[in-house]
A protein has these predicted regions:
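N-terminal accessory segment at the very beginning of proteins
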Residues: 1-205
């Protein structure tokens, strides 16, 4: 089900909620949450985003959101999302089956620090807290997205890597800060689009 709420498109299903926020006439922000937890998700919505003009249509099979230079198609059966140029050329498509998953887990915080150990590593001396007392903190999620890349498409970005890889297609990349490795969760395609991930966590491509 698609609902226009202020200047966002709210997509509701039994699996979860997706809020689509137009940031410009060719860029959107997607916020995915479980069930009705969307209200607890904070986001900034600038005046520029509020000025973006868009329309949406809803039929038996699909929901379409149309901006001046971007069309988004949501398949009702699979909940997969596709992105198109105004001329109908496909930019990016999620796979039809289990396009995104969210697995909840319990996080913990340190209530009382234990003994401190200083250990020499390849990245220098690291400080580790041993035997700390942990208490439950927040309910967080392991998230996963599945895309169908196009033939001949090259993917670049995700930061500075020690492996010297330019085109990331067919390679596994771990995004974390260590030594000379600098993680930047921005993926750029040779087809002219980009994906910026904002999960405040480590990531595996």
């Amino acid at each position: 089900q698609g609902i226009r709420q202020e200047n966002t498109l709210l997509l509701l299903s039994q699996a979860g909620t997706i809020r689509v926020i137009p940031m410009s006439d060719c860029a959107v922000r997607m916020i995915c949450t479980r069930s009705d937890e969307q209200e607890n998700c904070k986001f900034d919505q600038s005046r520029k985003a509020c000025a973006v003009q868009w329309t949406f249509t809803d039929d038996d099979q699909s929901i379409f959101m149309r901006l001046a230079n971007l069309t988004i198609k949501i398949d009702k059966k699979s909940a997969s999302i596709s992105y198109y140029k105004p001329d109908g050329t496909c930019l990016l498509k999620e796979r039809d089956r289990d396009s995104r998953t969210m697995e909840s887990f319990q996080s913990y915080r340190v209530e009382q620090a234990g003994r401190i150990e200083h250990i020499q590593t390849a990245d220098g001396v690291k400080t580790f807290v041993k035997d700390a007392v942990r208490v439950p903190d927040k309910q967080l999620y392991h998230t996963r997205m599945h895309f169908e890349w196009q033939d001949g498409e090259a993917l670049y970005g995700l930061g500075q890597h020690e492996e010297g890889i330019l085109n990331l297609r067919g390679h596994c990349v771990y995004l974390h800060q260590a030594n000379r490795k600098i993680a930047i969760p921005l993926l750029v395609s040779s087809l002219g689009y980009g994906i910026l991930m904002n999960t405040a966590s480590t990531m595996i491509f």
